[in-house]
Amino acid sequence: MTITNYINNQFTFLDMAEPWQLGFQDPATPVMEGIINFHHDLMFFLISIVVFVCWMLFRVITLFDEKKNKIPATVVHGATIEIIWTSIPALILLTVAVPSFALLYSMDEVIDPIITLKVIGSQWYWSYEYSDNLEFSDEPLIFDSYMIQEDDLAIGQFRILEVDNRVVVPTNSHIRVLITASDVLHSWAIPSLGIKLDACPGRLNQTSMFIKREGVFYGQCSEICGVNHGFMPIVVEAVSLEDYLTWLKNKINFDFNVXLIKFYGI
């Protein structure tokens, strides 16, 4: 057993914002990995452009000083330099745009999901529905998720981030997420999963996620939705497929073996 596997078996990773954090949270999905890699690649161009512009400004200030140039130059046209300062930015934009298009496409792509999670935002809580289990159960799994008040927090729980009912999903599985709202605009955002999607009343938005490792992932509503906007946390717990089915069995009554064979094909 490798050290990494040992750590994964002994601990549950917590992915959440930290005080004074400047960087990204650790990615748990291929989409978030792509976002971070694209950000790092883009920073090369941004830093290079900033350095070049600052150098040009410094050269202009030092070379075209009134004391050094009593008579200003009368250059009114330069075809070569105009072609250069038009073509180079265009090439830079193309270099940035092409990878971003591929990333945007992958964020919208839904690949044969085994679970559909319905998310409904309300003032000021989230509602969740698992309806795929209707194939082997009489009713869907529906529950609300409220923030745990500070006085009710247990040891080890986090202020303004913990909820009474977590979203539980399996790892290494394609999951479709359908998001809407019942009253005003909300936004379902989980940084570690690379998800930030608006919840709009009367409209159904769709995204997908493929979580690669077990852990607990924290997020919050990121659309100002009223006085308690800051008290709408999101907690997604990713577990193994067997643990997910065990959790589902404790919520609803169904045959465990039937679910494995009929629904998941294993």
Curated annotation (Swiss-Prot):
Top-level enzyme category: translocase
Cofactor: Cu cation
GO molecular function, one term: cytochrome-c oxidase activity
Signal peptide from the UniProt entry: none
Membrane topology listed for this record: Multi-pass membrane protein
Catalyses which reaction(s): 4 Fe(II)-[cytochrome c] + O2 + 8 H(+)(in) = 4 Fe(III)-[cytochrome c] + 2 H2O + 4 H(+)(out)
Main location as per UniProt: mitochondrion
Cofactor descriptive note: Binds a dinuclear copper A center per subunit.
GO biological process: ATP synthesis coupled electron transport
Mitochondrial matrix membrane side: 65-82
Keywords annotated in UniProt: Copper, Electron transport, Magnesium, Membrane, Metal-binding, Mitochondrion, Mitochondrion inner membrane, Respiratory chain, Translocase, Transmembrane, Transmembrane helix, Transport
Residues that span the membrane, as ranges: 44-64, 83-103
Amino-acid positions noted as binding Mg(2+) in the UniProt annotation, renumbered to this chain: E223
Record: residues binding Cu cation A2: C221, E223, C225, H229
Mitochondrial intermembrane side: 1-43, 104-266
Database matches in InterPro entries: CcO_II (IPR045187), CcO_II-like_C (IPR002429), CcO_II_C (IPR034210), Copper_CuA (IPR001505), Cupredoxin (IPR008972), Cyt_c_oxidase_su2 (IPR014222), Cyt_c_oxidase_su2_TM_dom (IPR011759), Cyt_c_oxidase_su2_TM_sf (IPR036257)
E.C. designation(s): 7.1.1.9
Self-association and partners: Component of the cytochrome c oxidase (complex IV, CIV), a multisubunit enzyme composed of a catalytic core of 3 subunits and several supernumerary subunits. The complex exists as a monomer or a dimer and forms supercomplexes (SCs) in the inner mitochondrial membrane with ubiquinol-cytochrome c oxidoreductase (cytochrome b-c1 complex, complex III, CIII).
PANTHER family hit by this protein: CYTOCHROME C OXIDASE SUBUNIT 2, CYTOCHROME C OXIDASE, SUBUNIT II
Stated role: Component of the cytochrome c oxidase, the last enzyme in the mitochondrial electron transport chain which drives oxidative phosphorylation. The respiratory chain contains 3 multisubunit complexes succinate dehydrogenase (complex II, CII), ubiquinol-cytochrome c oxidoreductase (cytochrome b-c1 complex, complex III, CIII) and cytochrome c oxidase (complex IV, CIV), that cooperate to transfer electrons derived from NADH and succinate to molecular oxygen, creating an electrochemical gradient over the inner membrane that drives transmembrane transport and the ATP synthase.
Listed NCBIfam families: CoxB (TIGR02866)
Family of this protein: Belongs to the cytochrome c oxidase subunit 2 family.
Protein name from the UniProt record: Cytochrome c oxidase subunit 2
Protein's organism: Phytophthora megasperma (Potato pink rot fungus)
